[in-house]
């Protein structure tokens, strides 16, 4: 991490290096693109707070950073995508270029859907915990033994399947819940009933039934529980790596390093 101007100070900026190699593709990841903010120190929290993401993530009056460093991660991804485009263009023009990715602009891209909503409708988006869902059944439920699971029924057909699957014939026949729009309007009466009934069922049972029926579901998992995820282990998405240094040097850890269909266990090295 360098302050703005550091690379120029050492003669390692694009303007200097491109004079040595005109085919150079130079990726720089910044806090802010050139403009009034470019001198500021950027952190993921900084751009999440000023870029609307923390506002949308937390409850009203309680802005909250996302549960991972989304801008650090995606800023690097945007830089890599830009480099790939520059490689294609260099194949046509024979010339390199500088690619700039920035945390703040990346964050604004992430909240772009909410900005567009306001631009089109004039209605500002509410924070996600306070939003009015487009579907009535689209929530996290606390079930047997205190476990939690996300369940959804996002169409009238899925609502019918949901009710048949769980034996909720009375809810399916209730005219108040006939269509999705009506279910959304009646959410304050419907959700307490669903929460009470679902609390008697286990997350494992609901997962199995929803999977067989093709309904959306997701048990709530902690990051450390993903090491035992059967899908991740079957696809090779988790790779064993040997730590090169530090107090745990030589030890093996598992990381999410799969690229495409090739597992990191099958490494392919290409010349630089």
Residue ranges and their predicted role:
Residues 6-153:
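Active-site-adjacent "lid/gating" segments in soluble enzymes
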Residues 137-213, 217, 265:
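Aromatic-enriched alpha-helical interface/lid elements that frame and gate functional surfaces
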Residues 128-133, 139-140, 185, 247-254:
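Short Gly/Pro-enriched turn/cap motifs at secondary-structure boundaries
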Residues 28, 103, 173-179, 219, ...:
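Structural signal for conserved beta-strand scaffold positions within catalytic alpha/beta enzyme cores
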Residues 35, 179, 226-227:
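Short secondary-structure capping/turn micro-motifs that flank functional sites
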Residues 262, 266-272:
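Single conserved hydrophobic/aromatic residue that forms the stacking wall/gate
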Residues 212-263:
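A glycine-rich dinucleotide-binding beta-alpha-beta segment and adjacent secondary-structure elements
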């Amino acid at each position: 991490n360098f302050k703005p101007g550091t690379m120029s100070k050492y003669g390692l900026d694009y303007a200097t290096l491109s004079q040595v190699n005109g085919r150079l593709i130079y990726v720089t990841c910044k806090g802010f693109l050139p403009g009034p903010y470019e001198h500021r120190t950027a952190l993921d929290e900084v751009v999440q707070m000023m870029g609307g993401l923390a506002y949308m993530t937390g409850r009203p009056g309680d802005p909250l950073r996302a549960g991972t460093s989304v801008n650090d991660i995606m800023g690097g991804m945007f830089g890599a995508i830009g480099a790939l485009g520059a490689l294609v263009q260099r194949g046509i023009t024979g010339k390199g270029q500088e690619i700039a990715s920035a945390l703040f602009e990346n964050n604004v891209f992430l909240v772009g859907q909410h900005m567009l909503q306001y631009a089109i409708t004039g209605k500002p988006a509410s924070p996600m915990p306070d939003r009015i869902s487009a579907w009535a059944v689209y929530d996290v439920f606390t079930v047997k033994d205190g476990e939690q699971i996300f369940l959804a029924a996002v169409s009238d057909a899925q609502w019918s399947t949901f009710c048949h699957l769980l034996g909720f014939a009375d809810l399916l026949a209730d005219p108040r819940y006939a269509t999705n729009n009506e279910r959304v309007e009646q959410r304050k009466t419907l959700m307490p009933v669903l929460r009470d009934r679902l609390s008697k069922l286990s997350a494992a049972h609901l997962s199995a039934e929803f999977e067989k029926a093709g309904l959306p579901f997701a048990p709530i998992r902690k990051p450390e529980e993903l090491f035992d995820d059967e899908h991740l282990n079957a696809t090779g998405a988790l790779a064993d790596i040997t730590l090169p240094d530090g107090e745990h040097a030589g030890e093996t850890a598992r990381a999410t390093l799969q690229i495409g269909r090739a597992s990191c266990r099958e490494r392919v090295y290409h010349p630089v």
